[in-house]
A protein has these predicted regions:
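N-lobe entry segment of adenylate-forming
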Residues: 1-51, 55-70, 75-76, 92, ...
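ANL superfamily adenylate-forming
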Residues: 45, 132-188
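Conserved AMP-binding/adenylate-forming
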Residues: 47-50, 64-107, 236
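Conserved pre-ATP/AMP-binding loop-to-beta segment of ANL
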Residues: 34-37, 171-196, 203, 226-232
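Conserved AMP-binding A3 loop
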Residues: 50-54, 185, 192-216
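Conserved ATP-dependent adenylate/AMP-binding module captured primarily in the ANL superfamily
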Residues: 65, 107-137, 217-234
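Conserved structural elements of the adenylate-forming
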Residues: 57-65, 188, 207-228, 236
Length: 240
């Protein structure tokens, strides 16, 4: 019976191209599915618009180039906020440029700052609502030179940067021939994601993950769940 069950299970596995890091995944997706829809988004008026795989790669490259220009290559970069396209490309860009530190938006401001301090994050990207949590107790933040990249802000002042302006700067740099982001070679086995546990059984702990860890999970799921090009995915739980 066990042998029969194993044979039946093996027949359900689907083949998938091997990927070991996010940069490889982005490059291959943009190459293979160039004009296909990667994200469906809502604008401020509630109208649906699309982002193709090529546009996704361009946006991650622009943001990544901007982060490098800010001196964040190989640094720890936090991301906080609700599920959004900006959150997604921030996570991808940060994990390629440095080490991404995703922080739960439901945490109290003290916990957010504690994770920032413990992780030694040099920058945090997020929406205005969640960045305010840090400003409430900014004196507790150990790194006084931390960069804040606000998804919603239109202005830049001191360490407060506008996501929109930084994206535009990144795009301009790429158009001018900057290839710093493209030159990055991702080691799939290095620490690239620092994820904090909920701490329900004690103090929260930092979990060190590589991009190979995440990619192997993606491939394992694809092995048993056949995904077609026409399939759409709706995200409810926090992306990280």
């Amino acid at each position: 019976m066990i042998l029969k069950a194993n044979k039946e299970l093996k027949q359900k596995y689907h083949k998938c191209e091997e990927i070991t890091n996010f940069k490889q995944m982005l490059d291959r997706s943009a190459e293979i599915y160039k004009t296909r829809i990667a994200f469906k988004l809502k604008d401020k008026e509630g109208k649906i618009y699309d982002k193709t795989y090529e546009e996704l790669k361009q946006d991650v490259t622009a943001l990544g180039t901007s982060l490098i220009e800010c001196g964040l290559l190989n640094k720890r970069i936090a991301v906080i906020g609700k599920n959004s396209y900006k959150w997604a490309i921030s996570y991808l860009a940060a994990s390629i440029v440095g080490i991404v530190v995703p922080i739960d938006k439901e945490l109290h401001s003290d916990d957010v700052i504690n994770f920032m301090n413990v992780s030694e994050s040099k920058c945090i990207l997020g929406d205005n609502k969640n960045l305010k949590k840090i400003n409430e107790n900014i004196e507790k933040l150990e790194n006084k030179e931390t960069l804040f990249i606000d998804f919603d802000s239109k202005i830049q002042e001191g360490n407060l940067l506008s996501f929109e302006i930084q994206m535009e700067k990144g795009k301009n740099l790429v158009e001018e021939g900057n290839t710093d982001f493209d030159k990055i070679i991702v080691n799939p086995d290095e620490l690239k994601i620092l994820l904090f546990t909920s701490g329900t059984t004690g103090n929260a702990k930092g979990v060190c993950l590589s991009q190979r860890n995440i990619c192997s999970n993606i491939l394992s799921i694809y092995g048993i769940v056949k995904v077609k090009r026409s399939d759409l995915f709706f995200s409810i739980l926090p992306i990280h």
